[in-house]
């Protein structure tokens, strides 16, 4: 639990996620502002259905991605690598996520793009501020945490 709490605190302070999807051997990555839900261990993003990454995702797809800062020295590197699943939200689930997203990013009220959830199933958090190469791992299915 401690690992997930540490990772969640760091993710709550960031705001841009990069995620990649694959379809028929073709890979594509995208970036977006995200809202992190620590209870569901998921990102919420907005992206238009006509985008290449949304077309490749369809209603849901496997994803992998990263969240990282931009430190000027190796000793300050912190970042997350993850794998999970992206899906487009519908109905009340979408409405609730959009309200929370709009609170975090008020400018998003101007957008009509659908809300998507990236459910994280595996997270590796690198935090060089705790020592070079310090990694923490969290796995959804097993609840496993490694430091």
Curated annotation (Swiss-Prot):
What superkingdom heads the lineage?
A: Bacteria
What's the family? Answer: Belongs to the UPF0306 family.
Q: What is this protein called?
A: UPF0306 protein YhbP
**Organism per entry:** Shigella boydii serotype 18 (strain CDC 3083-94 / BS512)
Gene this chain is encoded by: yhbP
């Amino acid at each position: 639990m401690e690992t997930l709490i540490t990772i969640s605190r760091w993710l709550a302070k960031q705001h841009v996620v990069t995620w990649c999807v694959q379809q028929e051997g073709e890979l594509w990555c995208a970036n977006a502002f995200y809202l992190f839900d620590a209870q569901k261990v998921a990102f919420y993003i907005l992206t238009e259905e006509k985008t290449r990454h949304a077309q490749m995702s369809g209603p849901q797809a496997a994803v992998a991605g990263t969240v990282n800062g931009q430190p000027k020295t190796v000793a300050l590197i912190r970042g997350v690598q993850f794998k999970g699943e992206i899906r487009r939200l519908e109905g009340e689930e979408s409405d609730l996520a959009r309200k929370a997203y709009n609170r975090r990013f008020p400018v998003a009220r101007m957008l009509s793009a659908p809300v998507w959830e990236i459910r994280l199933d595996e997270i590796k958090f690198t935090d060089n501020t705790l020592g070079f190469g310090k990694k923490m791992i969290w796995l959804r299915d097993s609840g496993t945490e490694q430091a």
